[in-house]
């Protein structure tokens, strides 16, 4: 800035004017060469606050060394324009210019920094206020180059000096201020803060983020420690964030409210319904108004009532669901459970009721609690009427169903279904006449099997001993047990039978054909004497008490008093009949009484019928205990004694006529029965060491095949099986097919008087020969690269075997490999396949 010298500075000194006439000094040119002084009317209407603000401003900016006293002139230090003594010359920014305007007169002009030039004590205060405001608003200082340019360019200053009665007041005017009262009030407040309060500078507010408004009440820390204050602040911030995120969290209370206020469109409960298909009218109780709330509560109460009603209905109808499958498989769950074919129809219902309590879990708590509620009359009757199906009908349906077990070849039969164990009474003539193959349905009779068919009782076939023989399953036939023929105690044959275990002799013809036996020779079992233990039932189902207890005596008709027996004894008696244990004592007694009645009837019935009149036509020699179970050589077969005992006759072989016409042979047997007049002294040796085993009657099937004749001559071992007595009035037992293919024993027959005895040629087992022939087959050459498997390879690969082809190959090629002259029938080959577990079938069904 150029220096104008002392002459120029003299013009800035304020003129001495009277106290009544204020003067406005205006600097027009930048060179400060001219000065125009305009007199202003001293208006008494100046606002009081404006005048007061000016006075306070002057007092605040006054210096202690230079007090401002009215009507006193002070010496001034002349400094350069815009400068202050001992300070840096700073330019005045354009925004800092002030304009003091009168509301009545707007023609006044302002002049800045004139007071600093005229008076030394006014300029420093003005500069301090401006610099203080610059620091607060814009902390960054401009550069020195910018300061010099602004000093040269913006050098025009305006101001107003007011002189009161004794004081001279100079007030700068700001252009930007439009309301002078607000401007002076803010200036007065800033002066007070700079003067005495010394407050801290306010921090600048961040514009890029606004904190969340704290709606919680501020917690007051009584301790006032800075650590607690910081912890409270952090806790408040964390609470704010939790409250913000709590709206997105899962609330269990809201879910319960939705479930309580939810109302389905359909009354019926739904299962497996997606959320998209749920009704849209599910609302909480908070969102519903008073009317919908009332309707919702009523609907929910009705819905809850319906649900409770359905639950009550389920509890009332809660019972064990018994299906046909469960009843069918329930017979084979326990070893003591009897077969359904051997249970009388009168005890079927009792058996089912005894099975059902065993399946239910015991509930001791319910039994210990006393029943306070009384039974409502009529509820049991309604429950009985509303039962879906009675149990007896389901059981009758089970009894009529054919339960078949085995492979496909075993199930492929052409006979009637009653052959498979559906008819318990095999003694009827119509069943025997209609069925081609008479197969016993009892497990004990399953030991006697023919060459062409086996017992179809899977459980009986599975029970074998170590030697391969079939075991007797303890089954009690409560319907029609066969009485046992017991010899007299004084008979000498009883002692002879125990010594003759290795061979049996042929009795004479009269004893073989038999005649009617006296009632004294046939002794009935004592059904009521003694207690039947479980060990007795495990030995044999048809073995009765000892002969010493079953002698001629009156039958006791009085029923035993089961009430005096203890519960374990009753359980043992019940187990002896083949039933499962029952919890209720009354039920056990009732079941035992019914069993006793049915057993008494079965014991009394044979007294009105003739006893077994005929003895077997064929006497069988047993196999030694150490014999092989499957196949035996010809050397192991036991030959009959060459010298027959006294009173016996010589046998003869079965002729082809008798084989081809079994009806004729049976007719001749009946004729011999009638023609025989002399009773025999020696009873047939059919009892053996085991009292329950009786000799088996062999019936030769009607066939014209010569191969069948040769196969019938093979040695077999027929273990005698107990046969049931027919209910018909016939005087003889219908023959049964019972031959074991894996056992060998010579068959001895009787002949007329005068014929010579012929020794039976022992031949190897035909089944063993079939096995050897199949294994001896050489490998077949491949045809066009395709291998041709042998019969043994087909069997190993579980290929189905055509019986026709295998029989043809055995008769043509197979037996020649092992030098066997006999031939076999397809039915015999099928029997061999079934004994080996081979799947086989006929190519052309007949």
UniProtKB/Swiss-Prot annotation:
GO cellular component terms attached to this protein's record: Slx1-Slx4 complex
Chief place of localization: nucleus
Compartments (UniProt record): Nucleus
Keyword Acyltransferase assigned: no
PTM remark: Phosphorylated in response to DNA damage.
Signal peptide start and end residues: none
InterPro entries referenced in this protein's UniProt entry, alphabetically: Slx4_ascomycetes, Structure-sp_endonuc_su_Slx4
Pfam families named in the record: Slx4
Biased composition (Basic and acidic residues): 141-153
Transmembrane intervals: none
Biased composition (Basic residues): 306-318
Domain of life: Eukaryota
A molecular-function term among this protein's GO annotations: 5'-flap endonuclease activity
GO biological-process terms attached to the record: DNA recombination; DNA repair; DNA replication
Keyword terms of this UniProt record: DNA damage, DNA recombination, DNA repair, Nucleus, Phosphoprotein
Region of interest (Disordered), ranges: 1-20, 84-111, 123-164, 283-322, 480-513, 624-690, 723-751
Compositionally biased residues, Polar residues: 293-303, 657-680, 725-751
Protein function: Regulatory subunit of the SLX1-SLX4 structure-specific endonuclease that resolves DNA secondary structures generated during DNA repair and recombination. Has endonuclease activity towards branched DNA substrates, introducing single-strand cuts in duplex DNA close to junctions with ss-DNA.
Entry similarity comment: Belongs to the SLX4 family.
Quaternary structure annotation from Swiss-Prot or TrEMBL: Forms a heterodimer with SLX1.
Protein's UniProt name: Structure-specific endonuclease subunit SLX4
Lineage, top ranks: Eukaryota, Fungi, Dikarya, Ascomycota, Pezizomycotina
């Amino acid at each position: 800035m150029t220096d104008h010298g002392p002459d120029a500075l003299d013009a800035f000194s304020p003129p001495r004017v009277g106290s009544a006439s204020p003067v406005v000094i205006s600097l027009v040119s930048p060179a400060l060469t001219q000065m125009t002084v305009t007199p202003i009317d001293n208006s008494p209407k100046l606002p009081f606050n404006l005048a007061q603000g000016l006075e306070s401003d002057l007092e605040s900016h006054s210096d202690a060394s230079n007090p401002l006293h009215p009507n006193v002139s002070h010496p001034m230090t002349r400094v350069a324009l815009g400068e202050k003594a001992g300070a840096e010359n700073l330019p005045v920014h354009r925004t800092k210019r002030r304009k003091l305007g009168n509301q009545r007169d707007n023609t006044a002009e302002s002049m800045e920094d004139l007071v600093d030039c005229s008076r030394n004590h006014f300029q420093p205060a003005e500069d301090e206020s401006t610099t203080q405001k610059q620091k607060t608003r814009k902390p960054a200082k401009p550069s020195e180059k910018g300061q010099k340019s602004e000093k040269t360019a913006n050098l025009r200053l305006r101001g107003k000096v007011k002189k009161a009665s004794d004081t001279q007041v100079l007030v700068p005017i700001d252009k930007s201020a439009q309301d002078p009262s607000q401007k002076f009030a803010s200036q007065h407040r800033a002066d007070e803060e700079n003067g005495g309060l010394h407050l801290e500078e306010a921090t600048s507010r961040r514009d890029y983020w606004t904190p969340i408004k704290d709606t919680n009440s501020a917690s007051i820390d009584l301790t006032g420690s800075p650590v607690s204050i910081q912890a409270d602040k952090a806790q408040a911030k964390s609470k704010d964030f939790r409250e913000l995120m709590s709206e997105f969290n899962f609330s269990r209370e809201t879910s319960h409210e939705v479930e309580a206020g939810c109302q389905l469109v359909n009354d019926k409960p739904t299962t497996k319904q997606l959320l998209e298909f749920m009704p849209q009218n599910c609302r909480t109780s908070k969102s519903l108004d008073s009317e919908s709330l009332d309707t919702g509560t009523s609907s929910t109460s009705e819905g809850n009532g319906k649900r409770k009603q359905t639950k009550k209905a389920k509890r009332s109808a809660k019972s064990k669901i018994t299906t046909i499958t469960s009843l069918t498989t329930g017979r084979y769950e326990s070893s003591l459970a009897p077969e359904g074919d051997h249970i009388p129809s009168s005890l079927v219902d009792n058996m089912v009721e005894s099975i059902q309590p065993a399946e239910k879990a015991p509930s001791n708590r319910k039994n210990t609690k006393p029943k306070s509620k009384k039974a409502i009359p009529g509820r049991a009757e309604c429950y009985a009427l509303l039962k879906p199906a009675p149990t007896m009908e389901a059981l009758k349906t089970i009894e009529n169903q054919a339960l078949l077990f085995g492979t496909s070849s075993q199930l492929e039969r052409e006979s009637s279904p009653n052959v498979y164990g559906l008819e318990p009474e095999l003694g009827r003539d119509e069943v025997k006449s209609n069925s081609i193959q008479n197969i016993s349905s009892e497990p004990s009779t399953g030991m006697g099997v023919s060459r062409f068919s086996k017992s179809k009782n899977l459980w009986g076939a599975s029970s074998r001993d170590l030697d391969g023989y079939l075991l007797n399953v303890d089954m009690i036939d409560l319907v029609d047990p066969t009485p046992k023929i017991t010899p007299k105690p004084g008979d000498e044959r009883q002692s002879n039978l125990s010594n003759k275990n290795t061979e049996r002799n042929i009795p004479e013809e009269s004893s073989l054909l038999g005649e009617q036996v006296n009632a004294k020779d046939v002794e009935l079992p004592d059904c009521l004497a003694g207690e039947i233990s479980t060990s007795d039932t495990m030995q044999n189902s048809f073995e009765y008490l000892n002969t010493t207890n079953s002698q001629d005596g009156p039958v006791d008709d009085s029923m035993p008093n089961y009430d005096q027996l203890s519960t374990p004894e009753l359980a043992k008696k019940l187990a002896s009949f083949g039933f499962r244990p029952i919890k209720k004592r009354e039920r056990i007694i009732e079941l035992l009484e019914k069993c006793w009645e049915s057993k008494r009837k079965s014991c009394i019935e044979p007294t009105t019928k003739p006893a077994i009149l005929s003895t077997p036509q064929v006497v069988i020699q047993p196999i030694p205990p150490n014999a092989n179970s499957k196949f035996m050589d010809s050397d192991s077969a036991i030959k009959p004694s060459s010298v027959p005992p006294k009173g016996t006759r010589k046998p003869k072989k079965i002729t082809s006529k008798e084989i081809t016409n079994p009806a004729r042979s049976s007719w001749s047997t009946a004729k011999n029965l009638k023609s025989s007049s002399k009773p025999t002294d020696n009873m047939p040796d059919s009892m053996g060491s085991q009292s329950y085993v009786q000799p088996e009657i062999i019936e030769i099937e009607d066939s014209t095949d010569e191969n069948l004749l040769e196969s019938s001559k093979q040695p077999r071992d027929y273990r005698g099986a107990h046969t049931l007595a027919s209910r018909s009035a016939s005087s003889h037992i219908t023959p049964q097919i019972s031959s074991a293919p894996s056992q060998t024993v010579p068959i001895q027959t009787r002949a007329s008087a005068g014929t010579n005895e012929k020794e039976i040629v022992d031949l190897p087992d035909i089944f063993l020969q079939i096995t050897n022939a199949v294994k001896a087959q050489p490998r077949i050459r491949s045809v066009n690269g395709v291998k041709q498997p042998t019969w043994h390879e087909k069997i190993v690969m579980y290929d189905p075997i055509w019986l026709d082809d295998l029989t043809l190959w055995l008769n043509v090629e197979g037996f020649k490999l092992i030098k066997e002259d006999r031939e076999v029938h397809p039915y015999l080959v099928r029997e061999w396949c079934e004994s080996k577990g081979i799947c086989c079938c006929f190519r052309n069904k007949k």
